[in-house]
C-alpha cells in the first residue's frame, strides 16, 4: 500500500483543536498518557499469549523504552506490546468509535477545557495529548503475531489530515516519535524525563528504560580508577521506575501522591479521586483491591455501551481492564484494580460469569464500598454530599436491583424535601426521627424538579398539617420506591396517588361528615362533570387534600402518575391506557360559581367550558401537556373579557 493522505473525522479534528489550543497548566501529562497506553498494550499481548504463545515472538518480557534525541529534536516512546493493524490504526486514531462523541464535544465547548482537562482523559483519547508538545507525530506499529512486512506508519501534524502506509517492522509493538515544538525541547532533558516518570508512572509494572550516558574515569580490572587516563563516556540502559504494583504494598508504604497518580493511570481522569479504598481480603477468597470513588461523574455514565468494571489481575498478571462481573451495575463509577490469588491465569469471560470466587470477591467488594460510603456519610458529611450529587442517581439503582444490600443502600439515600432548603438533603432515618406525633407514613412526590414540585397542589394539606414531603426528582426514583415499600416500619406513600390523606381517626370522621354534606350540595354537579370528562378521567370526586387550589389529578393507589408516564414516553416505551381521578376542592369559589350556574340552567354551555378548563388546569399544574392549547387560551380570554365587563358594570 502506497502512502495515503486522509482526513480526520470532524469530531477528531475538533478534539485535536481543543487539545492543541487549550492552555494546560501541566503539559507533562502527555508522557504519562503515552506510557499508560504502552503499558495497556503490553498487558494485552501478554494476556493473548495465554491462548496463543506465538504472539510473544520470543520476547516474553514487556518493556517501554524512552529515546530522547537532542540532535533531531525528537522524543520516541517504544513498546513491545500488542501493536496494531492498519485497520486498527485508522479506527483508534483517525476516528472516534463512540456514539457519545457529539455529547462529549458539546460538554467540552460548554466548559473551559483548561480548567477541566479530565474531560479529555475520560474519553480515552490521551494519545492526542502528544500534540500539546509536538508539531508532528509519527507512529510505527505492527500487530503481534503478524508478518514483519505488515507494519503500519502513521503521521500527522494535527492540521486535519494524516498519512498512513504499510511498512516493514522487525519487532512487535508500537513506536511513537514526537517531533517537539521548539519551546518544548526541555522534554529531551534526562532530569525532566526522570522526574515525570517518577511522579506519574513509577508503579507501572513493566520497566520504563532509557539509555543514559555518564562521563567517568576508566577503571582497572579490580575496579580502581586509572590515574592519568582521562575520562570516557559510557552509555547504559537504566530503568526509571520501581515497577512495584502499588496495590501489593501496605497502605502505610503508599503516599497520597502515589495513590493519586495511580488513580489517574487507571481512570484516565485528570483530577484527584474523592476517596481511596485499599484493602486485602483473606480466608475463603484471597485478593487485594485498590478502588477509587471519582470526584465527578464521567459524561458517558449513563450510556449503555460504556466500558464498566475494574481491572482484574491474577497474581499480578493482567487479565482484563473492565471486569464487569466484579461489581454490580449500580457501582459502575468505581475505578481501580483487583488482584486475585485464587483464579486461574487462563480465566475466560465465560468462567468469570460463573466462577464462585468471582461471586465471593464481588460480595466482599460491594460490602466494603457500601461500608465506606456509610462511614463517609457519618463522618465526612460534606464529602459524601459531593459524592451523592454526582453519583446518587446511579447508587439508587441498587435499591431496585440488589435486594441483598437494600438495607445498607436505603440508609445512603438523600432527598430534598418541603422541610429543606434547595440544595440541602435529608436521609430517610432523619425524616423518620423528625416525624410529628400522629404521622404514620413517609410521604413523597415524584417529578422533574424541585421547583415544579414545590407548586404542586398535592402538597397543600401536608403543608397545612406540617408534614414533611420528600421531593423525588431523579427518573430512577420511580423504580426506587417500587423496591422500597417501607423504611423503619413506616410505609412510603405518594401524595399524588390514592386517597392518602394524613388524619387522625377523629379527623377522618370529621372529613367524612364534611364530604357527605358536600356531596349533597355538589352530587349532581359532580355527576355532570364526570359525564363531560368521561373520555379523560376515571372518576370525579371532592378532595380532602386541596386547601387552596381548585383541582388536581391523582392516580389510583397502584396506577401510573404523570411523572411515570413522562418517563416511559421519554424511553420510547408504550404507555398503558389509564385514566386518573379528578379531585375538586369543595371550598373553592369556582365550585360555588359552577353550582349556582348548574342550579339555574343545566344546559348552560359555559358549564362544559368550565369542565374543560378545570381538567386542563389540573394538567398544567402537574406539568403535563394539554390536548388543545388553542381552545384553552380562547376560553381563558373569553372569561377575562366576561369578568372585565362585569367589573366595569356593563
From Swiss-Prot:
Tagged with keyword ATP-binding: yes
Region (B): 350-566
Pfam family, one: HATPase_c_3
Any GO BP: response to heat
Subcellular location(s) of the protein: Cytoplasm
Gene Ontology molecular-function annotations: ATP binding; ATP hydrolysis activity; ATP-dependent protein folding chaperone; unfolded protein binding
Region (C): 567-650
Any one cellular-component term (Gene Ontology): cytosol
InterPro entries attached to this UniProt entry: HATPase_C_sf, Heat_shock_protein_90_CS, HSP90_C, Hsp90_fam, Hsp90_N, Ribosomal_Su5_D2-typ_SF
Gene3D superfamilies for the chain: 3.30.230.80, 3.40.50.11260, Heat shock protein 90, C-terminal domain, Histidine kinase-like ATPase, C-terminal domain
Chain intervals for the UniProt region annotation (A): 1-349
Keywords attached to this entry: ATP-binding, Chaperone, Cytoplasm, Nucleotide-binding, Stress response
Quaternary state and interactors: Homodimer.
NCBIfam families linked: PRK05218.1 (NF003555)
Role this protein plays: Molecular chaperone. Has ATPase activity.
Membership in a protein family: Belongs to the heat shock protein 90 family.
HAMAP family membership: HSP90 (MF_00505)
Protein name per its UniProtKB record: Chaperone protein HtpG
Organism expressing this protein natively: Geobacter sulfurreducens (strain ATCC 51573 / DSM 12127 / PCA)
Amino acid at each position: 500500500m502506497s502512502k495515503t493522505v486522509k482526513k480526520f473525522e470532524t469530531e477528531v479534528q475538533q478534539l485535536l483543536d481543543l487539545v492543541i489550543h487549550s492552555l494546560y497548566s501541566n503539559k507533562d501529562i502527555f508522557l504519562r498518557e503515552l506510557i499508560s497506553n504502552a503499558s495497556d498494550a503490553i498487558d494485552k499481548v501478554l494476556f493473548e499469549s495465554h491462548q496463543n504463545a506465538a504472539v510473544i515472538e520470543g520476547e516474553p518480557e514487556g518493556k517501554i523504552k524512552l529515546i530522547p534525541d537532542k540532535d533531531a529534536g525528537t522524543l520516541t516512546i517504544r513498546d513491545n506490546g500488542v501493536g496494531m493493524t492498519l485497520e486498527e490504526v485508522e479506527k483508534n486514531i483517525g476516528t472516534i468509535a463512540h456514539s457519545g462523541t457529539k455529547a462529549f464535544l458539546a460538554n467540552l465547548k460548554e466548559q473551559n477545557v483548561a480548567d477541566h482537562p479530565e474531560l479529555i482523559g475520560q474519553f480515552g483519547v490521551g494519545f492526542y495529548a502528544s500534540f500539546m508538545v509536538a508539531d508532528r507525530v509519527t507512529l510505527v506499529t505492527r500487530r503481534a503475531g503478524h508478518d514483519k512486512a505488515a507494519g503500519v506508519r502513521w503521521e500527522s501534524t494535527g492540521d486535519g489530515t494524516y498519512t498512513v502506509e504499510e511498512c516493514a517492522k522487525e519487532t512487535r509493538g508500537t513506536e511513537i516519535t514526537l517531533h517537539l515544538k521548539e519551546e518544548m525541547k526541555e522534554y529531551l532533558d534526562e532530569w525532566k524525563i526522570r522526574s515525570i516518570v517518577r511522579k506519574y508512572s513509577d508503579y507501572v509494572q513493566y520497566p520504563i528504560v532509557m539509555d543514559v550516558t555518564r562521563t567517568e574515569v576508566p577503571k582497572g580490572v579490580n575496579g580502581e580508577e586509572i590515574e592519568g587516563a582521562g575520562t570516557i563516556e559510557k552509555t547504559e540502559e537504566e530503568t526509571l521506575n520501581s515497577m512495584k504494583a502499588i496495590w501489593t504494598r501496605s497502605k502505610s508504604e503508599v503516599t497520597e501522591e502515589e495513590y493519586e497518580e495511580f488513580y489517574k493511570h487507571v481512570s484516565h481522569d485528570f483530577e484527584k479521586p474523592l476517596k481511596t479504598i485499599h484493602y486485602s481480603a483473606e480466608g475463603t477468597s484471597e485478593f487485594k483491591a485498590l478502588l477509587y470513588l471519582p470526584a465527578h461523574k464521567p459524561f458517558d455514565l449513563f450510556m449503555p455501551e460504556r466500558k464498566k468494571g475494574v481491572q482484574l489481575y491474577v497474581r499480578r498478571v493482567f487479565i482484563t481492564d473492565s471486569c464487569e462481573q466484579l461489581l454490580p451495575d449500580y457501582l459502575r463509577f468505581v475505578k481501580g484494580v483487583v488482584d486475585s490469588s485464587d483464579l486461574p491465569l487462563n480465566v475466560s469471560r465465560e468462567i468469570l460469569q460463573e466462577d464462585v470466587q468471582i461471586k465471593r470477591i464481588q460480595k466482599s467488594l460491594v460490602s466494603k464500598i457500601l461500608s465506606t460510603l456509610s462511614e463517609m456519610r457519618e463522618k465526612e458529611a460534606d464529602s459524601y454530599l459531593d459524592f451523592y450529587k454526582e453519583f446518587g442517581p446511579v447508587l439508587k439503582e441498587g435499591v431496585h436491583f440488589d435486594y441483598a444490600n437494600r438495607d445498607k443502600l436505603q440508609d445512603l439515600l438523600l432527598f430534598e424535601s418541603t422541610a429543606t432548603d434547595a440544595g440541602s438533603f435529608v436521609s430517610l432515618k432523619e425524616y423518620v426521627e423528625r416525624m410529628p406525633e400522629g404521622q404514620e407514613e413517609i410521604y413523597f412526590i415524584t417529578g422533574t424538579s424541585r421547583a415544579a414540585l414545590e407548586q404542586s397542589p398535592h402538597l397543600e394539606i401536608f403543608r397545612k398539617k406540617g408534614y414533611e414531603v420528600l421531593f423525588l426528582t431523579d427518573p430512577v426514583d420511580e423504580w426506587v420506591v417500587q423496591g422500597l415499600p417501607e423504611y423503619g416500619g413506616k410505609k412510603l406513600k405518594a401524595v399524588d396517588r390514592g386517597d392518602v390523606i394524613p388524619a387522625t381517626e377523629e379527623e377522618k370522621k370529621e372529613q367524612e361528615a364534611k364530604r357527605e354534606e358536600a356531596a349533597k350540595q355538589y352530587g349532581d354537579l359532580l355527576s355532570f362533570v364526570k359525564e363531560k370528562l368521561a373520555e379523560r378521567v376515571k372518576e370525579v370526586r371532592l378532595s380532602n387534600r386541596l386547601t387552596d387550589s381548585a383541582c388536581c389529578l391523582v392516580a389510583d393507589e397502584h396506577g401510573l402518575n404523570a411523572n411515570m408516564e413522562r418517563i416511559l414516553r421519554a424511553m420510547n416505551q408504550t404507555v398503558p391506557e389509564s385514566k386518573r381521578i379528578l379531585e375538586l376542592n369543595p371550598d373553592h369559589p369556582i365550585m360555588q360559581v359552577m353550582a349556582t350556574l348548574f342550579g339555574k340552567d343545566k344546559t348552560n354551555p359555559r358549564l362544559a367550558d368550565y369542565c374543560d378548563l378545570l381538567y386542563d388546569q389540573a394538567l398544567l399544574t402537574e406539568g403535563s401537556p394539554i390536548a388543545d392549547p388553542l381552545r384553552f387560551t380562547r376560553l381563558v380570554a373569553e372569561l377575562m373579557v366576561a369578568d372585565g365587563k362585569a367589573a366595569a358594570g356593563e
